[in-house]
UniProtKB/Swiss-Prot annotation:
Site, Aromatic residue of the functional dyad: residue positions: F33
Molecular function terms from GO: ion channel inhibitor activity; potassium channel regulator activity; toxin activity
Coiled-coil features, chain-numbered ranges: none
Pfam families in the record: Toxin_2
Domain of life: Eukaryota
GO cellular component: extracellular region
Cell compartments where the protein resides: Secreted
UniProt name for this protein: Potassium channel toxin alpha-KTx 7.2
Organism of provenance: Pandinus imperator
Note on domains (UniProt): Has the structural arrangement of an alpha-helix connected to a beta-sheet by disulfide bonds (CSalpha/beta).
Cysteines paired by S-S bonds: C4-C25, C10-C30, C14-C32
Function: Potent inhibitor of the A-type voltage-gated potassium channels. Most potent inhibitor of Kv1.2/KCNA2 channels. Reversibly block the Shaker B potassium-channels (Kv1.1 sub-family), but with a lower affinity than PiTX-K alpha.
Amino acid sequence: TISCTNEKQCYPHCKKETGYPNAKCMNRKCKCFGR
């Protein structure tokens, strides 16, 4: 898991992981969403 303070920090990681730059920052951790 990637730690974060806002979801913008998660986008590059999630784009790599799921192919979509969709993410939320929950409890200081990135949560990726496909589509």
